[in-house]
Amino acid sequence: MNEFFSSDRDFSEDVVKQQSMVVAQHNDLITKAKYDLTTNEIKVMDYIISKIKPADEEFDTVHSSLYEISNVLGLKRSGRTYNQLTNTLRNLRQKEVIIYNEDTETATVTGWLQEFDVTRTGQVEAKISLKLAPYLLELKSKGHYTQHVLSDTIQLDSKYSIRLYKLMREADKNRGKIAPVIKHTPEELAVLMSAPKSYASWGRLNDKVIKPAIDEINLKIIDMDLELHTKKRGRKVVEVEIYNTFYPRKHSIKNPVPMTNWLNK
């Protein structure tokens, strides 16, 4: 598309308020979904999901603007940025997400967005794919959901950091009373992180994906202090464990860091 967004229009909302919005999604969208999105594509989709209200029973059209999206994501506001965001929205409509349902033994294949419109002045209307409704709507009644503050994923620079962050949030079943942990074979972890096949060996996966993701999360996320452990059979790594040691491993604590349950508001 042409870079026709030549000037900023002030569609401003409080950026801090926007970044404090909660992203809630069914656990299957974190642990069983296969997709390959860029860092900014994940952030834009998280932003759109954060617009869903707790009581929504169907997807409403999300009304926003390229100005607002760039502001919330901390991007430089320019015609070039707006053009890139438009292409990001296009990719979210075209790129596949595959979610396997073990109960029905079916795989749902869909795009992230059903459709979107962008005006010449940069206003955006987007609608989430209807196939994602079971994973984003009426989560309180379904249970098995994970929530996080939008600002957490916005500040992460790597798509692998965001994927690992979401996995660790999903693993926090006891809201900080016991240290969350994920345990997988290197092969399973590579799939969950959507790592390329060239990172098939544990050494390469750790160097290029896992260690950098852990380092960035530990630096930027205030309630995460991730620690990596491996189990070996001979010289081969057969299991990977990642703990959030910000919380105690085995014993409960009297005053855990509070996490507001957005769905109970």
Put a short name on every predicted segment:
Residues M1-K265:
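Charged, alpha-helix-forming regions
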